[in-house]
């Protein structure tokens, strides 16, 4: 906002604007803008305004904000410069508190608690324009009506009585042959001073006040949209939106997300949010994670939905948008793991979600997409994956898919990848036990936890007799793997607190301790 927003910049900078009040260190911000596309209208606007500061071969514009604290004046005055060569920038010309940049960029700052009525009244002259010929006649009628209204008000008995009382009181101080007259001055210039937006239901002539805060918020965005259109031809609109989720329920936040990230009007958009729902439709965005502790630097990562994930975009974004607000993320195979682990953590670590722990099922997406973003944002993540085998076509052998997956996640070939001859529970256990030393090393150094077999078989190893009792089935594994979702729900409803602690403390499910402790 200091770089682009004239309303903020004209306030200058105080000592509190300097990090930790280090007043001996000047503030310097450099914004780089790519203008390589000469056919783009926004690039053309910049090139036209920069003139001599930009040569034809320059493909980037550098905008520099510099402010040095003056201890005598007790403030810092901003200096803005720009150009196509970072080492030879020209200082911007200034007219009053406006810089050259203010004639190109139009900053639309939308506060999280913006007042609808104040916004409407402030901009009503821009929003409501009477430019048609027939409006002239209507305005004349309104003026005549206002004159009649003023005359009627002045003729009220209460007004006359007040005049009769006030005149002699005034004449006590100065008798100069005058009288006091009370007149109404309702004028056409205040034509819009009392108009208010109302919600009107289709097929219903009744008007409803826009009392709901969510409704007001949506009307506010609608007004800002109209105002931005007024400047779109002449200026580049920058939308700066603070916490748009306030007063909007989940479905409206998701609807707003679709508008913000798909409407070309919001090409240049900066959003601060605490809500994952606002990010559901994100694509081609730079995610910046701001920490609550005293870290100087935030963490950022560019995120684009890969082409092969476009069909699963909503699923990918939904889980990712929630994960990036967490401090720790446990990535699991699917809904069965999610349900079981949520149950266990809710018992052992009751407020795990409030403590920033999130369980993310990667079903249909895979681990890698999530891991890459979480790692870039420095969000601690734990992986729990199955010891899968896959038949090699025409060979009668099986590739060790689970081992290959682990090698991929840790970035080195620590586990053997030779094909094996058998696909069975015992073969998977034997493969695991033969490599347990390296698997434990991968656990401790990379937080990647491979199942001995899979969720159901590993759980059966932990509490076989207890599963027999709870499920009343001779083969708990087969039962849980048949109608997996339904039967897992049945199981977790029957698990006791003791059962949950048994699972939590067992080697097979050490991933839970890893993420919780």
Model regions: which residues?
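Switch/communication elements of ASCE P-loop NTPase nucleotide-binding domains
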Residues: 1-5, 192, 197-320, 338-339, ...
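Flexible phosphate/Mg2+-sensing switch loops adjacent to catalytic phosphate-binding sites
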Residues: 5-26, 295, 354-355
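Glycine-rich phosphate-binding loops of NTPases
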Residues: 10-22, 37-143, 403-437
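Conserved catalytic network of the ASCE P-loop NTPase/AAA+ motor domain
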Residues: 20-25, 54-58, 69-71, 99-103, ...
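Short glycine-/polar-rich loops that comprise or flank the Walker A/P-loop
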Residues: 25-29, 58-63, 103-107, 283-286, ...
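Hydrophobic positions in the central parallel beta-sheet of the AAA+
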Residues: 108, 239-241, 330
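Extended helical coiled-coil dimerization/tether regions that scaffold
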Residues: 125-237, 392-396
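Acidic, Mg2+-coordinating catalytic modules of nucleic-acid enzymes
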Residues: 319-329, 338-517
């Amino acid at each position: 906002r200091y770089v682009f927003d004239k309303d903020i910049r004209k306030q200058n900078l105080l000592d509190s604007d300097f990090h930790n009040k280090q007043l001996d260190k000047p503030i310097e911000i450099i914004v780089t803008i790519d203008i390589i596309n000469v056919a783009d209208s926004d690039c053309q606007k910049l090139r036209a305004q920069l003139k001599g500061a930009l040569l034809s071969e320059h493909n980037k514009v550098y905008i520099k904000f510099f402010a040095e604290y003056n201890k005598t004046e007790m403030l810092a005055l901003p200096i803005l410069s720009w150009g196509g060569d970072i080492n030879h920038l020209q200082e911007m010309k200034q007219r009053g508190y406006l810089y050259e940049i203010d004639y190109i960029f139009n900053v639309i700052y939308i506060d999280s608690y913006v007042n609808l009525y104040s916004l409407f009244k402030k901009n009503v002259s821009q929003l409501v324009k009477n430019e048609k010929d027939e409006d002239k006649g209507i305005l004349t009628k309104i003026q005549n009506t206002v004159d009649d209204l003023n005359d009627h008000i002045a003729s009220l008995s209460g007004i006359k009585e007040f005049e009769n009382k006030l005149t002699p009181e005034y004449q006590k101080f100065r008798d100069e042959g005058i009288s006091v007259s009370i007149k109404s001055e309702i004028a056409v210039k205040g034509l819009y001073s009392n108009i208010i937006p109302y919600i009107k239901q289709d097929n219903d002539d009744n008007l409803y006040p826009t009392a709901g805060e969510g409704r007001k918020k949506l009307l506010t965005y609608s007004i800002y949209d109209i105002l931005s259109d007024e400047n779109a031809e002449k200026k580049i609109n920058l939308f700066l939106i603070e916490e748009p989720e306030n007063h909007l329920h989940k479905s409206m936040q998701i609807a707003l997300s679709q508008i913000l990230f798909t409407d070309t009007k919001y090409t240049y958009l900066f959003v601060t949010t605490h809500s994952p729902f606002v990010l559901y439709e994100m694509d081609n965005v730079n995610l910046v994670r701001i920490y609550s502790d005293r870290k100087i630097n935030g963490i950022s990562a560019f995120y684009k939905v890969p082409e092969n994930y476009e069909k699963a975009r909503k699923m990918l974004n939904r889980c990712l948008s929630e994960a990036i607000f967490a401090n720790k993320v446990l990535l699991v195979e699917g809904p069965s793991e999610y349900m079981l682990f949520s149950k266990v953590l809710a018992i052992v670590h009751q407020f795990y979600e409030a403590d920033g722990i999130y369980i993310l099922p990667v079903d249909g997406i895979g681990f890698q997409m999530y891991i890459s973003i979480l790692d870039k944002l420095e969000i601690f993540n734990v992986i729990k994956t199955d010891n899968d085998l896959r038949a090699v076509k025409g060979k009668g052998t099986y590739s060790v898919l689970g081992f290959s997956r682990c090698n991929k996640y840790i970035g080195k070939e620590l586990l053997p990848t030779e094909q094996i001859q058998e696909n069975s529970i015992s073969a998977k256990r034997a493969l695991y036990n033969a490599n347990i030393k390296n698997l434990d090393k991968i656990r401790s150094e990379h937080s990647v936890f491979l199942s001995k077999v899979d969720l159901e078989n590993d759980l059966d190893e932990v509490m076989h007799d207890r599963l027999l009792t709870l499920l009343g089935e001779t083969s708990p594994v087969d039962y849980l793997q048949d109608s997996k979702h339904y039967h897992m729900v049945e199981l977790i409803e029957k698990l006791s607190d003791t059962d949950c602690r048994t699972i939590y403390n067992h080697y097979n499910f050490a991933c839970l301790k890893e993420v919780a402790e």
